[in-house]
Curated annotation (Swiss-Prot):
Molecular functions (GO terms): DNA-binding transcription factor activity; TBP-class protein binding; zinc ion binding
Sequence repeat intervals: 123-207, 218-299
Name listed for the protein in its UniProt record: Transcription initiation factor IIB
Organism expressing this protein natively: Methanopyrus kandleri (strain AV19 / DSM 6324 / JCM 9639 / NBRC 100938)
Protein family: Belongs to the TFIIB family.
SUPFAM superfamilies xref list: Cyclin-like, Zinc beta-ribbon
UniProt cross-references to PANTHER family, sorted A to Z: TRANSCRIPTION INITIATION FACTOR IIB, TRANSCRIPTION INITIATION FACTOR IIB-RELATED
The keyword Acetylation is annotated on this UniProt entry: no
Keyword Ribonucleoprotein tagged: no
Organism lineage: Archaea, Methanobacteriati, Methanobacteriota, Methanomada group, Methanopyri
PROSITE patterns on file: TFIIB, ZF_TFIIB
Length: 307
């Protein structure tokens, strides 16, 4: 269906997650969303171009090919052919034989255990990435890590959700767009975030992942945006974090908790007070964590608060 036809509101297309045909176009974010389960069925930014660069017409001619760039988060990497949904002959009549061929073609593509695993995992990845608002680059990186984990036999004996969650956690850290293990676990429906962390440690060891630890500052922009505070509050929170690091009081502390405490302090100092409960909900940490961190920071930096 043409983009001009699709941007009118609702259109008929099946959601890959729940099978609903009610897909709605979100004009504000430029996304197609399933009205039934909330899955974003298409990314707001689509790169139809090749993954290579060219610097003159000759290079372009030599490197040109058909098809879209490879996508690691598709079970077949997006390089297989697809039989059209229309299933009509040259005269415009429906062709039942082509419907059967299309059905068997789809079944064959996921007939192996690996293909079935990838199909389930990457469908879950799209749903998870949609909930966490992850960019295309992070989705592809997570799919790459998951594929390596499968090849190394890490998925065997563990749930798809825990390994996939760990792959997303690792991809977010690598891309410096952090999401906490608790956020990922909640989005996946995993009851214990430690399942994600245990699987992540296995990935680190078996895949030799070398990643810098997440800093409290990495969380600040997202938390501040969700809380609706001004740039002054964010700048003050950044200043508090830097001073706390100099004093050595952030060592061994969860970065999300430190960022949350710094924002709590900054919001009060800048006259834009946010409650501990509000910040805890955004940061996915407990109010107790915020209280402990903000008291430690205030004591170390000599800050007097009157909450």
């Amino acid at each position: 269906m043409a983009a001009s036809e699709r941007n009118t509101g609702k259109f008929t297309e099946e959601c890959p997650a729940c099978g609903s045909a009610e897909i709605v176009f979100d004009e504000e974010r430029g996304e197609y969303v399933c009205a039934n389960c909330g899955l974003v069925t298409e990314d707001p930014v689509i790169d139809p171009g090749p993954e290579w660069r060219h610097f003159n017409p000759d290079q372009r001619q030599r490197r040109s090919r058909t098809g879209e760039p490879v996508k690691l988060r598709l079970p077949d990497k997006g390089i297989s052919t697809i039989i059209d949904r229309e299933l009509r002959d040259s005269g415009g009549k429906k062709n039942p034989r082509m419907r059967r061929i299309r059905t068997w073609d789809a079944r064959i593509k996921v007939s192996g255990s690996r293909e079935r695993n990838f199909f389930q995992a990457f469908l879950e990845l799209e749903n998870l990435a949609s909930k966490l608002q992850l960019p295309e680059s992070v989705r592809e990186l997570a799919a790459s890590i998951y594929r390596k984990a499968y090849k190394e036999g890490i998925v065997r004996g563990r749930g798809i959700e825990s390994v996939l969650g760990a792959a997303v956690f690792a991809a977010c850290k690598e891309a410096r767009v952090p999401r906490t293990a608790r956020e990922i676990a909640e989005a996946l429906g995993v009851s214990d975030e430690n399942e994600i962390l245990r699987a992540y440690r296995v990935l680190q060891r078996r895949l030799n992942l070398k990643q810098k630890p997440t800093e409290p500052s990495d969380h600040l922009p997202r938390f501040a945006s969700k809380l609706g505070v001004s740039e002054n509050v964010q700048a003050k929170a950044q200043e508090i974090i830097e001073k706390a690091k100099e004093k050595g009081i952030t060592v061994g502390k969860g970065p999300a908790g430190v960022a949350a405490a710094a924002l709590y302090i900054a919001s009060i100092l800048e006259g834009e007070r946010r409650t501990q409960k509000e910040i805890a909900e955004v940061a996915r940490v407990t109010e107790v964590t915020i209280r402990n961190r903000y008291k430690e920071i205030c004591e170390a930096l000599g800050i007097e608060l009157h909450p």
